[in-house]
UniProtKB/Swiss-Prot annotation:
GO CC annotation terms, alphabetical: cytoplasm
Binding positions (Zn(2+) 1): 60, 62, 146, 313
Lineage: Archaea, Methanobacteriati, Methanobacteriota, Stenosarchaea group, Methanomicrobia
Keywords, alphabetical: Hydrolase, Metal-binding, Pyrimidine biosynthesis, Zinc
Organism the protein comes from: Methanosarcina mazei (strain ATCC BAA-159 / DSM 3647 / Goe1 / Go1 / JCM 11833 / OCM 88) (Methanosarcina frisia)
The encoding gene: pyrC
Cofactor needs: Zn(2+)
Name by which UniProt lists this protein: Dihydroorotase
A Pfam family of this chain: Amidohydro_1
One GO BP annotation of this record: 'de novo' UMP biosynthetic process
UniProt entry tagged with the keyword Zinc: yes
SUPFAM superfamilies (alphabetical): Composite domain of metallo-dependent hydrolases, Metallo-dependent hydrolases
Family assignment from sequence similarity: Belongs to the metallo-dependent hydrolases superfamily. DHOase family. Class I DHOase subfamily.
Binding site for substrate: 62-64, 94, 317
Catalytic function, reaction form: (S)-dihydroorotate + H2O = N-carbamoyl-L-aspartate + H(+)
Length: 456
């Protein structure tokens, strides 16, 4: 007896949309085909012609727990993910306490296991704790980072002299380093130079394109020298995309796999410096909003394969915390619930093809972070039934009052999006009919490769 029978749907297969039915048993996709004769099942979903796609994998969220639960917690953050078609997330380490040793890791893991409704990984923090990285790797962290090369929320930025040593240890462990690339020296110099600037786009001026480009160049040199596997978080500039494209081309020319992957966020794709006046403090994030030339470069990078994936960098703050002062306002915007809907709208608007969007939001993240080994990332037989059912014709404006994050606001207010009708996680419907359909704690911890190898 199947657990779920999805009928009257369409899937992307062999480079085209095709009618299909899907049978799900024990949390896995067991059959994909047409005209199945099923005598009974626990649940039949009539998709009525809507698409069934792999659910999103968001490799960059800040669910703020422990320590900052006024902003978000594992339950509210995971509900936002589910409502947006995300079935797997990877949480970042800049909580209170930061996830930098056994005690803090186990504290976060216990909270996530009690509250999350989606599957999750946990990254380990990297500052001056290089002697703790092996322990964290054996405990099951997904990756290390984001390693902050410049100041950001949580105070986890690494000293310049420790950065290469940390990457060397991550290489020795066979782990993955995820990097927040901004040049701290340049940022501090510009902060002093612009201390009298009160313009709304101050934040983009104090962290300009060159700030990211300098840090990316530095990191690429160390990555190449050490041979460490790395991932660049939230690339945002024309210059950085050009560097990444060149390095990937050189690797391909030598028939080598690049040592690194990279992500871009929806806020760097769909918002720009033109939005500073409208958004004010609600447009402040690190790295900051960019100009139209960078946005065009990011879109081109998505389409030509330079950029590997899209991630939300969901970093919520309450409206009251943002305050009126652009300098004092904390950096970060909510985004996990709007990631997939905005990307689906981009497909509808011919910004990128559906096949590319699927790769960017499911398979590429799964492969880069080792989640493919755990059955994540594809709508295929034997993979986890992590799925979203969506009608691509159903464009609607994003509204803060329809979202589930504790933040209570969104920088994407009024922008067209396509929200899912259903979200499934391991064969369980966790979002349907515009409501959460899951209990806290059903989410599964996805152990990292260090834990898996220890058990082999």
């Amino acid at each position: 007896m199947p657990d779920i029978h999805i009928k009257n749907t369409r899937i992307y297969y062999n480079n085209s949309l095709q009618p299909a039915e899907i049978i799900i048993e024990h949390g896995k996709i067991t059959k994909i085909g047409k005209d199945f004769r099923v005598s009974s099942s626990d649940m039949v979903i009539d998709a009525k012609g809507s698409l069934t796609l792999p659910a999103g994998i968001d490799v960059h969220v800040h669910f703020r727990e422990p320590g900052m639960t006024l902003k978000e917690n594992w339950y509210t953050g995971s509900c936002a993910a589910a409502a947006g078609g995300i079935a797997t997330v990877i949480d970042q380490p800049n909580t209170i306490p930061p996830t930098t040793d056994r005690r803090s890791f186990e504290q976060k893991l216990e909270l996530a296991r009690k509250k999350s409704i989606v599957d999750f990984g946990i990254n380990g923090g990297v500052t001056g704790n290089i002697e703790k990285l092996k322990e964290l790797w054996r405990l099951g962290v997904t990756a290390f980072g984001e390693i902050f090369m410049a100041e950001s929320t949580g105070g986890l930025n690494i000293k310049e002299e420790d950065f290469e040593e940390a990457l060397a240890e991550i290489k020795r462990l066979g782990a993955l380093a995820t990097i927040h690339a901004e040049d701290e020296k340049m940022r501090l110099e510009l902060e002093q130079l612009l201390k009298g600037d009160v313009s709304c786009d101050y934040h983009s001026k104090v962290r300009p394109n060159a700030c990211e480009a300098s840090a990316v160049q530095c990191a690429l040199e160390i990555i190449s020298r050490l041979g460490v596997k790395a991932h660049f978080c939230h690339l945002s500039t024309l210059e950085a995309v050009g560097m990444i494209r060149k390095e990937k081309y050189l690797a391909k020319r030598e028939n080598k796999e690049p040592l690194f992957t990279c992500e871009v966020t929806p806020h760097h794709l769909f918002l720009s410096t033109r939005d500073w006046e409208r958004l004010g403090v609600f447009g402040k994030m690190n790295p900051p909003l960019r100009g139209s030339h960078s946005i065009k470069a990011l879109v081109n990078g998505l389409n030509d394969g330079t950029i590997d994936m899209v991630a939300s960098d969901h970093a919520p703050h309450l409206e009251s915390e943002k305050g009126p002062d652009i300098r004092a306002a904390p950096s970060g915007v909510p985004g996990v619930e709007t990631l997939m809907p905005l990307m689906l709208a981009a497909v509808r608007k011919n910004i990128l093809p559906l096949a590319k969007m699927i790769m960017l939001t499911s398979w590429n993240p799964a492969r880069a972070f080792g989640l493919d080994l755990l059955g994540k990332g594809k709508l295929e037989v034997s993979y986890d039934a992590d799925l979203m059912i969506v009608d691509p014709r159903n464009l609607q404006p994003v509204r803060a009052d329809m979202l589930h994050s504790k933040a209570g606001w969104t920088p994407f207010e009024g922008i067209d999006a396509v929200f899912p009708e259903y979200t499934l996680s391991r064969g369980e419907v966790i979002w349907m009919e515009e409501s959460i359909n899951a209990k806290p704690g059903r989410g599964k911890f996805l152990e990292g490769k260090g834990k898996m190898s220890e058990e082999d």
